[in-house]
């Protein structure tokens, strides 16, 4: 089961809604194939999953 995304950047609604997620999380979900480190203003290390097909759009 894919995790939900609160801040979707681009959604694909051709089937099940899936999106490129803008959420910053303490660690990427184990199923994420493209996890990128994000620099934050607070200095806290956060990550963002950039796998387009991965997240369900929670805010739809």
Curated annotation (Swiss-Prot):
GO terms for biological process: negative regulation of endopeptidase activity. One of its GO terms (cellular component) is extracellular region. One of its GO terms (molecular function) is serine-type endopeptidase inhibitor activity. It comes from the Eukaryota. Signal peptide: none annotated. InterPro entries: Bowman-Birk_prot_inh, Prot_inh_BBI. Disulfide bonds join 5-21, 11-19, 28-35, 32-49. The record marks 13-14 as: Reactive bond for trypsin. Expressed in bulb (at protein level). Keywords: Disulfide bond, Protease inhibitor, Serine protease inhibitor. The keyword Disulfide bond applies. Serine protease inhibitor. Strongly inhibits trypsin (Ki = 0.22 nM) and very weakly inhibits chymotrypsin (Ki = 1200 nM). Does not inhibit bacterial subtilisin. Belongs to the Bowman-Birk serine protease inhibitor family. This is Bowman-Birk type proteinase inhibitor C1. It comes from Hyacinthus orientalis (Common hyacinth).
């Amino acid at each position: 089961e894919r995790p939900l995304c609160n801040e979707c950047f681009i959604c694909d609604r051709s089937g099940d809604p899936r999106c490129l997620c803008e959420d910053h999380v303490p660690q990427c979900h184990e199923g994420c194939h493209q996890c990128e480190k994000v620099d934050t203003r607070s200095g806290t290390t956060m990550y963002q999953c950039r796998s387009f097909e991965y997240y369900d759009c929670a805010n739809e």
